[in-house]
Structure formats: structure tokens, C-alpha cells
């Protein structure tokens, strides 16, 4: 295969959105799969809305996802600069060439005149387009209009007849009639190029071979192909990937949930899980497997398995995939992810002392199997902080009225006060001793202890839970629960 050069060119007007992240990922994977180059540049010609802060946020999000690039912003390269506002001279040169060859012209129409044209087309039931009023202005006409203070835009002269055909690598053959396009603006009155013009110049000068982007850009492609042809440039191959829809099959938006990568990062999703999920929004591996490492994806990705049909953003599936990765994640990493949420909840503060660090560590270990993303750890705070017990149901409270409960809780309290270090392994051994001493097994031992400690019949890992609560916390919980349930444990003192 030819040397593949692909790019991702975000506009720095806000955070990196899910759709943009998927486009970046597909480009990255194609380049890595076939030994090509992945370029990241910035389309910052929206001067009012663009900011370096947004640029940094987007680049940081790409790096967090593990999407690296070979050339472009932050890394440099032979086609620098990689911001459009630093490349304005190249667009001016191309526009001047088109003007000189009669393939573009200056248009002096006011916004009011253009709006009247749009309304006229709408009344006839036609798509709005430019009428061509300024197509054949004489030099005297232009001088007069400039004297009136009008600042021209530059429009591309679209052929009156014919069609522009695209052989899209995802959508197949698509054709657009030139008559429906109309002469479009390539340079605004302030000298800033429009998207359709600048992107062609950039892609051509950076030798881009494949453009992989969202389906919403398909309608831009005929305009871009006309510019390629007018400048005598070879266009890249195009692949327009499907839209991302919400579960109600409308276009993904904030009402469906978080739409930016940073929002998922802040909620404690793992980047490798989000990458795994994003690639499945439109790409099929061809089998039943759904969990892929980045290396797996690089080895398998190809455009021929990218679907035409829209992809549905399924939060339940994302949570399932992230849960799979959380189960395998290093505990220290999860503790770091949990800390901002615990700090915000006000139950810990940095720097942690030894006792607090131990508590948080074992809390995270206890809930690792129970959460889909780390922000959910706050739901478990009542189980780990404070001595208060609230029974989740009458059924849970009734567990403590079972015949064997007093001897089980007494034995548990004895073991807790023996002085051995509390670790998950030691707690596991301790609970085995309780079953042996009481001659009770399974549910008859573990359920009353769990209910006494948490007020719940189901919950996080019991060994890590007791370790996180600590000796005093666990003893106080058991005593308090027994008191609330009317369970007599006797008057034996249990020192901590």
C-alpha cells in the first residue's frame, strides 16, 4: 500500500468531542496499521471562538487517549506551521492564482442582498445558493463598489453544468450536481480563508493521502474537489464515517449525556476503555470479541470494516467495557482516580495521613468490582465513613434476628479485637475461623456480618471492607447494628 498520510484537524473552539475523538482514532489506527504518518494540525480561523486554551485541551485529550502523532502541533515537522492562522500567506497565494485564472472572483454583495436571494430561492422551494450577481463585474464596477466602502469576499466560480463525483471508501459512489452548489466563498472579507478552501491547501501541501472524517462533511467534499481540480492538485481518498446517534437515534448531543472526552476523563473512565468503546462506534472487528487493546486495534483496523449505518452511543455498553478494564487495573492507579471524587465529597483531604491512605486504598479495593467508573465511588461513602448504620430494607434488618446471629457476631468481635494486623488476607482467615468456631457456614456467617457492617445484604468485597473500616470502625458498626436490631451480644467488653 502507498505511504499513508492522514490527519486530524480540529477547530480549537471547545473541548474534544466524542465524534472528533473517534475521527482522530480512526486516522491514527490507519496510519499505525500501515506504517504511515499521522498529522495533527489546528484549524483556528474562527478568530472569535478559537483559543489556545481549547487547543491545549484538545491536544491533552488526544494524548490522554494514547493517540500520538508523528507531525504537527507540539511535535513539529517539515510542513510547519500547523496552525491555519500562521499559514495565511499560502491561502492568499492560492486565491490570487484562482483570481488571475478567472476561476474565482470578488463579490461585493451585502448581507441584506444575499438574504433576499436566499428568501427568493426558498419561496421557489429550491436550496439557497448564490445567484452569481458579481460574476462578471468590470473593473469600473469593482472600483465603484469599493468606493462605496464595500469589502469583497472571494468566490469560487463553479461550473454551470456537470457533476462532481466521489468514490468514497465508506459510502461508495456519490455524485453532486454543480448547478446545486452555487459559487461559494473561499476567502472572507477580512482575508481569512473559509474551511473548504484552507483545508484543500493544507491537505495538498502536507501530502495527505486519505481524509477520514464524519459524514456531516460529505456535502463539503464536492466544493473541495472543485478547488483541487482548479489548482491542478491531486485530491486524497475520502472516507466519511457515520454519525454518532443517541439511543433515541437522534444526533448525539448533551441531552444524551457527556459529549466531551474530558468529561469522561473527569468521571474516572480509563482511556484504554474509551478508545475500545469509540472504535466500535462504526467499526466492526468481524467477530464476537469486544475487548481490544490498542495493539490489537492497530493490528486489525481497516476501512473496509467501517459501517455506513449510524453508530449508537450506548452508555451501558461503555460502562460495561470500562468495568472490564477497571477490574484489571492497578490498584494504585485506581486510588489516584478515586481521590478527586473523595476530596470533592469532603471525606478526605490531601495530604493523607497513613490511616487515611490505608482506608482509601482498601475502600478502592473493596469497590473495584462494583463500579463502572470511578466517580461512582461516592455512592459507597456511607459504607466506609462514620459509624452510622441504616438498614436498606426490613429484609436486611431481619437477617440479624436469625438464630445463629448472636454467636456469629460475638465470634467476629472476638477475632477483631485479638490484635492481629487487619489486611484482606488476614480478615479472610479470621472469617474462616469464625465459621469453624460457630460451626456455621456460608451465608449464615457472611450475611449477618455484612448486614451488621453495612445495613445491606449485598455490597463490596467483605475482606477489603473490614480492612478499610479498621478495627475500631468495624467493632462500632457491629455493636451499633446489633443494638438497632435488638440483638443481645452480652456485656463482654471489646477493647480496640
Swiss-Prot record:
Stored InterPro entries: aa-tRNA-synth_I_cd-bd, aa-tRNA-synth_I_codon-bd_sub2, aa-tRNA-synth_I_CS, aa_tRNA-synth_I_cd-bd_sf, Glu-tRNA-ligase_bac/mito, Glu/Gln-tRNA-synth, Glu/Gln-tRNA-synth_Ib_cat-dom, GluQ/Sye
Residues that coordinate or bind ATP: 254
Residue window of motif 'HIGH' region: 10-20
Position of sequence motif 'KMSKS' region: 251-255
GO BP annotations listed: glutamyl-tRNA aminoacylation
EC number from the UniProt entry: 6.1.1.17
Catalytic activity: tRNA(Glu) + L-glutamate + ATP = L-glutamyl-tRNA(Glu) + AMP + diphosphate
Source species, domain of life: Bacteria
Subunit composition and interactions: Monomer.
NCBIfam families registered for this protein in UniProt: gltX_bact (TIGR00464)
Function summary: Catalyzes the attachment of glutamate to tRNA(Glu) in a two-step reaction: glutamate is first activated by ATP to form Glu-AMP and then transferred to the acceptor end of tRNA(Glu).
Family: Belongs to the class-I aminoacyl-tRNA synthetase family. Glutamate--tRNA ligase type 1 subfamily.
Name of the protein: Glutamate--tRNA ligase
The organism of origin for this protein: Heliobacterium modesticaldum (strain ATCC 51547 / Ice1)
Amino acid at each position: 500500500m502507498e505511504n499513508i498520510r492522514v490527519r486530524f484537524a480540529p477547530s480549537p473552539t471547545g473541548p474534544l468531542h466524542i465524534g472528533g475523538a473517534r475521527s482522530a482514532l480512526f486516522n491514527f489506527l490507519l496510519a499505525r496499521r500501515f506504517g504511515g504518518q499521522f498529522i495533527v494540525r489546528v484549524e483556528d480561523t474562527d478568530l472569535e471562538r478559537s483559543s489556545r486554551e481549547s487547543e491545549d485541551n484538545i491536544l491533552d485529550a488526544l494524548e490522554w487517549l494514547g493517540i500520538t502523532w508523528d507531525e504537527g502541533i507540539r511535535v513539529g515537522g517539515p510542513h510547519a506551521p500547523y496552525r491555519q492562522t500562521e499559514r495565511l500567506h499560502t491561502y492568499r497565494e492560492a486565491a490570487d492564482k484562482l483570481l488571475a485564472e478567472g476561476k474565482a472572483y470578488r463579490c461585493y454583495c451585502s448581507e441584506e442582498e444575499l438574504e433576499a436571494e436566499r428568501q427568493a430561492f426558498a419561496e421557489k422551494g429550491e436550496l439557497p445558493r448564490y445567484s452569481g450577481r458579481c460574476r462578471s463585474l468590470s473593473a469600473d464596477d469593482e472600483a465603484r463598489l469599493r468606493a462605496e466602502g464595500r469589502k469583497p469576499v472571494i468566490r469560487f466560480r463553479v461550473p454551470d453544468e456537470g457533476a462532481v463525483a466521489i468514490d468514497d471508501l465508506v459510502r461508495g459512489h456519490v455524485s453532486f450536481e454543480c448547478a446545486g452548489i452555487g459559487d461559494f466563498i473561499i476567502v472572507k472579507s477580512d482575508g481569512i480563508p473559509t474551511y473548504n478552501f484552507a483545508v484543500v491547501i493544507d491537505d495538498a501541501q502536507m501530502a495527505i493521502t486519505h481524509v477520514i472524517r464524519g459524514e456531516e462533511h460529505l456535502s463539503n467534499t464536492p466544493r473541495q474537489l472543485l478547488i483541487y481540480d482548479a489548482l491542478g492538485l491531486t485530491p486524497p481518498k475520502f472516507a466519511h464515517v457515520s454519525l454518532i446517534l443517541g439511543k433515541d437515534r437522534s444526533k448525539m448531543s448533551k441531552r444524551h449525556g457527556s459529549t466531551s472526552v474530558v468529561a469522561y476523563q473527569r468521571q474516572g473512565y480509563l482511556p484504554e476503555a474509551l478508545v475500545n468503546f469509540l472504535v466500535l462506534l462504526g467499526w466492526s472487528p468481524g467477530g464476537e470479541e469486544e475487548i481490544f487493546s490498542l495493539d490489537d486495534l492497530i493490528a486489525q483496523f481497516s476501512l473496509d470494516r467501517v459501517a455506513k449505518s449510524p453508530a449508537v452511543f450506548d452508555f451501558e455498553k461503555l460502562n460495561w467495557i470500562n468495568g472490564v478494564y477497571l477490574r484489571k487495573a492497578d490498584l494504585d492507579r485506581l486510588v489516584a482516580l478515586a481521590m478527586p471524587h473523595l476530596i470533592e465529597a469532603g471525606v478526605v483531604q490531601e495530604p493523607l495521613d497513613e490511616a487515611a491512605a490505608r482506608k482509601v486504598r482498601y475502600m478502592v479495593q473493596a469497590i473495584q468490582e462494583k463500579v463502572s467508573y470511578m466517580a461512582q465511588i461516592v455512592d459507597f461513602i456511607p459504607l466506609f465513613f462514620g459509624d452510622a448504620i441504616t438498614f436498606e430494607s426490613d429484609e436486611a434488618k431481619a437477617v440479624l434476628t436469625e438464630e445463629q446471629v448472636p454467636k456469629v457476631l460475638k465470634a467476629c468481635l472476638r477475632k477483631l479485637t485479638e490484635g492481629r494486623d487487619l489486611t484482606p488476607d488476614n480478615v479472610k482467615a479470621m472469617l474462616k475461623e469464625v465459621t469453624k468456631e460457630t460451626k456455621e457456614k456460608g451465608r449464615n456467617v457472611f450475611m449477618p456480618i455484612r448486614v451488621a457492617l453495612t445495613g445491606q445484604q449485598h455490597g463490596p468485597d467483605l475482606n477489603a471492607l473490614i480492612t478499610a473500616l479498621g478495627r475500631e470502625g468495624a467493632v462500632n458498626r457491629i455493636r451499633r447494628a446489633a443494638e438497632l436490631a435488638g440483638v443481645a451480644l452480652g456485656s463482654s467488653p471489646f477493647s480496640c
